[in-house]
């Protein structure tokens, strides 16, 4: 299977560097232990990439120091050699050598053709299944024995498990004596079902499908049944097979597979990655690429593609080494699992109130993307698997599958790991948690998210409704008075007076604050919607670009990309979310909430840019042309605010200062850089002022800045 010991490994060309004999000996021991665990249980202290780097390092050291090769080096062993049984194989069950790229594959084919002295005219291309290699013996068409690979010369008898192996019939279609070789694995569906059955019986879930297949195959006297699946990849005669033995020896590999399928044994023929016969290296590579593209959508795991010389004569001429045949190779695909560190656990609340844990990981590259988070099922699962902060964990990801933690690598624990703390109250709203089931739930259910969204909308940087904290929002939700924050604008005095601790004064004050919120500028109303990826600053930019909510809602992704800071992906996401928010926006309009941005002029309609006349607006007033911004005092400027404001700016929050900057045509920023045009520095300005001085950035005190943007201050105070 792999270059060393047949280990399933990732596509990589790097190797561990072993400086001396001691490092080599340690590497051999580590690789041997990892391979033993891998084939015995489906788990290992090394991920695929780490094992492969170690394996290549061992092979490189042995090539340079052949006199120092250790007897237990995995370079001379068949994969799975740790699980030795007492049933001899009639013909050794060998491993496969690996290639990791098109270039390496071409080199391998050239080597094979040199060895046999002629071109290979037929290739068999089939999926490399991520399971356990076994040999199934049939005598006179009846199942007799199931044997694991073991050390390649003898394996373990696991016949007791055959009854739960799909695709391995009790009786063949013909009364022949034959040995069928293949892989036993768990399909994705079997893995899910197996874990459900195990947890129902008080067991821990399998770490991964390979681990599940290994454990299931060796388990005896279970109180429950877990299914696996067999895929045949070859067949050979037994000593008393008679004429069949001679026939099998002459058949091309592709015809052997067809014969096995005709006997009623399961092969990959009925799958999207069915074995294919190719005549050129180019055809083989095309099939390799095709299988790789299908990998994520397959209902079972593969970790590569097996390529074999199809003709029996080519196989016989090429022969086999002590560990692998010379006429076949495994073309490995990128690893879909890696070991990394569990840094933290976040607790998130879904729309229905389900509290779900999410793992924060030390970023690691898996299957072509960087993974920093992984799903964790529920608190009970964390407890069962004894996950701890600081653990080295095996993380799985393939294609579009959400990354998940398979298991902690217990052997790598240092003693510094700490237990994961579970929340005592809802992390979203602070209410009690219903922990009676495996999936914990906020007792407020769907209302939990409602409390958070209404509280956010009423916050200081959004609608700024004074007196409407989360406690009051909980009251309103519990009383059934609000289903979204638009309902705040239809609250009646008598409804509020009926609530606990709501007297006449507090009621009138709240209603007055809500009435004021009705006049907030579009930027704040849009921010209150909570559109993902658009915070306060982005909301201001969107509002000033489009000027009205109607134009924002009507904008397509291309139009949104004209807003500074919005790319293609974010634009599409905003458009999609605005469609979902349309009913809420409609309620806000009906309630008389402001849907315009003071001082902003909408962009010209497509195709009318040249006809647009900038001078049509009063460029010297706050209502001037924001589309061009040419007459605004901060047009084209990037402004940073630091320190305590004074004078006319004293009562403005930092968010209000940023709004003021953007109303006056500028762009607000939180950090000083070479792009900064102006720093507004109040008392205790600190390091930002020092950096601005070093960079030669213009610095203004609050009073100077207030004079510069004086015409826009009134609009800011009203907001």
From Swiss-Prot:
Pfam families: BRCT, DNA_ligase_aden, DNA_ligase_OB, HHH_2. Residues 609-626 have a biased composition (Low complexity). The keyword Repeat does not apply. It is an enzyme of class 6 (ligase). Residues 596-626 are annotated as: Disordered. Its cofactor is Mg(2+); Mn(2+). NAD(+) binds at residues 48-52, 95-96, 126, 149, 183, 308, 332. Its EC number is 6.5.1.2. Gene3D superfamilies: 5' to 3' exonuclease, C-terminal subdomain (1.10.150.20), 6.20.10.30, BRCT domain (3.40.50.10190), DNA ligase/mRNA capping enzyme (3.30.470.30), Helix hairpin bin (1.10.287.610), Nucleic acid-binding proteins (2.40.50.140). It catalyses: NAD(+) + (deoxyribonucleotide)n-3'-hydroxyl + 5'-phospho-(deoxyribonucleotide)m = (deoxyribonucleotide)n+m + AMP + beta-nicotinamide D-nucleotide. Keywords: DNA damage, DNA repair, DNA replication, Ligase, Magnesium, Manganese, Metal-binding, NAD, Zinc. Residues 629-719 form the BRCT domain. It comes from the Bacteria. InterPro entries: BRCT_dom, BRCT_dom_sf, DisA/LigA_HHH, DNA_ligase, DNA_ligase_AS, DNAligase_adenylation, DNAligase_N, Hlx-hairpin-Hlx_DNA-bd_motif. Zn(2+) binds at residues 426, 429, 442, 448. SMART domains: BRCT, HhH1, LIGANc. GO terms for molecular function: DNA binding; DNA ligase (NAD+) activity; metal ion binding. NCBIfam families: dnlj, PRK07956.1. DNA ligase that catalyzes the formation of phosphodiester linkages between 5'-phosphoryl and 3'-hydroxyl groups in double-stranded DNA using NAD as a coenzyme and as the energy source for the reaction. It is essential for DNA replication and repair of damaged DNA. Belongs to the NAD-dependent DNA ligase family. LigA subfamily. This is DNA ligase 1.
């Amino acid at each position: 299977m792999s270059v060393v010991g047949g280990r399933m490994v990732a596509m990589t060309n790097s190797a561990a560097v072993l400086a001396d004999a001691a490092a080599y000996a340690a590497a051999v021991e580590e690789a041997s232990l990892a391979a033993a665990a891998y084939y015995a249980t489906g788990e290992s202290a090394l991920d695929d990439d780490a094992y492969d780097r170690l394996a290549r390092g061992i092979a490189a050291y042995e090539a340079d120091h052949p006199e120092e090769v250790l007897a237990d080096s995995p370079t001379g062993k068949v994969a799975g050699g740790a699980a030795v049984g007492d049933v001899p194989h009639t013909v050794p069950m060998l491993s496969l050598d690996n290639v990791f790229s098109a270039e390496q594959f071409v080199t391998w084919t050239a080597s094979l053709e040199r060895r046999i002295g002629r071109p290979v005219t037929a290739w068999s291309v089939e999926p490399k299944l991520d399971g356990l290699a076994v040999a199934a013996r049939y005598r006179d068409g009846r199942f007799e024995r199931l044997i694991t690979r073991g050390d390649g010369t003898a394996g373990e008898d696991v016949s007791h498990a055959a009854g739960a192996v799909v695709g391995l019939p009790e009786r063949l279609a013909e009364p022949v004596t034959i040995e069928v070789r293949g892989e036993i694995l768990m399909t994705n569906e079997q893995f899910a079902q197996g874990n459900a059955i195990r947890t129902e019986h008080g067991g821990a879930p399998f770490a991964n499908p390979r681990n599940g297949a290994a454990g299931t195959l060796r388990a005896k006297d279970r109180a429950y049944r877990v299914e696996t699946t067999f895929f045949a990849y070859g067949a050979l005669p037994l000593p008393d097979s008679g004429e069949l033995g001679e026939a099998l020896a002459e058949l091309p590999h592709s015809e052997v597979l067809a014969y096995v399928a005709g006997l009623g044994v399961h092969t990959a023929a009925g799958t999207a990655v069915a074995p294919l016969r190719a005549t050129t290296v180019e055809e083989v590579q095309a099939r390799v690429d095709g299988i790789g593209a299908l990998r994520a959508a397959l209902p079972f795991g593969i970790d590569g593609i097996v390529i074999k010389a199809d003709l029996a004569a080519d196989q016989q001429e090429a022969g086999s080494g002590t560990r692998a045949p010379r006429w076949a190779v495994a073309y490995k695909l990128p690893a879909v699992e890696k070991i990394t560190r569990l840094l933290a656990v976040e607790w998130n609340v879904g729309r229905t109130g389900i509290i779900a844990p999410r793992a924060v990981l030390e970023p690691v590259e898996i299957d072509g993307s960087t993974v920093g988070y992984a799903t964790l099922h529920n608190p009970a699962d964390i407890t069962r698997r004894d996950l701890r902060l600081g653990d080295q964990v095996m993380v799985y990801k393939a294609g579009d599958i959400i990354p998940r933690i398979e298991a902690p690598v217990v052997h790598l624990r240092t003693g510094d790991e700490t237990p994961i703390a579970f929340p005592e109250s809802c992390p979203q709203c602070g209410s009690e948690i219903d922990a009676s089931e495996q999936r914990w739930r906020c007792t407020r259910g769907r209302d939990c998210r409602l409390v958070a969204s209404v509280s956010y909308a009423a916050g200081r940087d959004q609608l700024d409704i004074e007196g409407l904290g989360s406690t009051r929002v909980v009251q309103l939700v519990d009383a059934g008075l609000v289903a979204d924050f638009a309902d705040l604008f239809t609250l009646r005095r008598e409804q509020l007076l009926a609530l606990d601790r709501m007297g006449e004064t507090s009621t009138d004050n709240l209603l007055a604050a809500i009435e004021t919120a009705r006049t907030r500028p579009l930027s704040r109303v849009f921010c209150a919607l909570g559109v993902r990826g658009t915070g306060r600053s982005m909301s201001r930019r969107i509002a000033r670009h489009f000027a009205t909510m109607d134009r924002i809602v009507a904008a397509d992704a291309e139009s949104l990309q004209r807003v500074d800071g919005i790319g293609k992906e974010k634009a599409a996401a905003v458009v999609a979310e605005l469609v979902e928010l349309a009913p809420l926006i409609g309620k806000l309009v009906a309630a008389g909430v402001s849907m315009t941005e003071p001082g902003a002029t909408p962009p010209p309609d497509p195709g009318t840019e040249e006809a647009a006349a900038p001078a049509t607006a009063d460029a010297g007033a706050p209502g001037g042309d924001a589309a061009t911004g040419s007459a605004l005092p901060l047009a084209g400027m990037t402004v940073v605010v630091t320190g305590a404001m004074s004078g006319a700016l004293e009562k403005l929050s930092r968010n209000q200062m940023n709004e003021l900057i953007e109303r006056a045509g500028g762009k607000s920023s939180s950090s000083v850089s070479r792009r900064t045009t102006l720093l507004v520095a109040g008392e205790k300005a600190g390091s930002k002022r020092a950096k601005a001085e070093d960079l030669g950035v213009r610095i203004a005190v609050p009073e100077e800045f207030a004079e510069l943007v004086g015409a826009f201050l009134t609009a800011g105070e009203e907001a």
